[in-house]
Structure formats: C-alpha cells, structure tokens
Regions:
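N-terminal leader/targeting and accessory segments in enzymes
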Residues: 1-101, 105
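Phosphate-binding loop of NTP-binding sites
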Residues: 14-20, 98-163
Length: 163
C-alpha cells in the first residue's frame, strides 16, 4: 500500500544510495523522479512508488520489474546487475538487507514521537483507535493494515514522512 496521499517526497536518490550502500550503475537511477510511496508487490503499486525486488521461497521480485515500471514505479531496487542496467535501478547486494537499512535510516531521520503497541491480541484495533485520537492533535502516521513482521515493519518505517 502506498502513502501517496501524504503528498510528500519520501526519499531522495542520495538518501537511497546512502542508506543501502547501493550503486547507481547507469547514473540514471530516478533521473529527477519523485518517490511518493514504497512497494514490494506490483498488484498494489502506484504511480511514483519505489519498487523493491525482494526474493522469497516461491517468488522473485526481479520477475516483476517490467510490470512495476509499466504501472508507474519511479525506480527499482535490485540485487541483479543485469536488472540494474536494464531498468536504471539501484544495485544492492541483498534487497532484504537494503529494506532493513532503509527502515533504520528512515527511523533515524524522523523527528516525531513514536509509539509501539505490543501484546497478544488487539494490537491493530488499538493502533487504529490511537491514530484517530492522535489525529485530533496533529499530523499522525500509523502502519497501514496489519504489518507485524520484519518486512511489514520495515516497509512502514520506509513510508514514514520526514515529520
């Protein structure tokens, strides 16, 4: 899910390269395009999203790069040099590690307050209620949906606006 509704640029080329220690092999990565959201799934990708080609047991995000570009991805993060060259992508050694590095970078640059909700039951409901309450006092960001694993948390942190 994209956070394009925030209407802010989420990442700059320099930040993505710095956080991932990636390489812009073609020097054309992003080419003045904006990153307004983050996606690892072409079924939900939106215009100006950054697509990260994760590899899993039953899938490889590199197989969906063409579709991501067709659907409006501004850029791609890849762990294959041939894909980086073909799609002007940012080449990283490991896209999973890059995702975690992006999350850490985003968390460190964020200057607002962060609240964590833990427990066995009711976390999503509590999070949704807290967001409604805190919205009354100012700008609020909450994890979209139910992203309670390492990939989901990392994606949520990557979507964290600057303020």
């Amino acid at each position: 899910m994209s956070n394009s509704s925030i209407n802010e640029i989420l990442w700059t080329k320099h930040e993505l390269i710095s956080a991932s220690k990636g390489k812009d092999l073609t020097t054309k990565f992003l080419n003045n395009k904006k990153i307004m959201g983050i996606s690892i799934d072409t079924r939900s990708i939106e215009q100006n999203d950054l697509f990260i080609a994760l590899k899993g047991k039953n899938f490889d995000g590199h197989d969906f790069l063409e579709k991501a570009i067709q659907k409006g991805a501004s850029g791609v993060i890849v762990s294959r040099k041939d894909s980086a060259l073909r799609y002007n992508g940012l080449f990283v050694k490991n896209t999973h590690a890059a995702l975690i590095n992006f999350a850490e970078f985003s968390r460190n640059r964020f200057k607002g307050k962060i609240i964590g909700i833990t427990g066995s039951n009711g976390k999503t409901t509590t999070k949704d209620m807290a967001k409604i309450i805190f919205n009354e006092f100012g700008k609020t960001f909450a994890t979209p949906g139910n992203n309670n694993n390492l990939i989901g948390l990392s994606l949520s942190l990557m979507k964290l606006p600057y303020n």
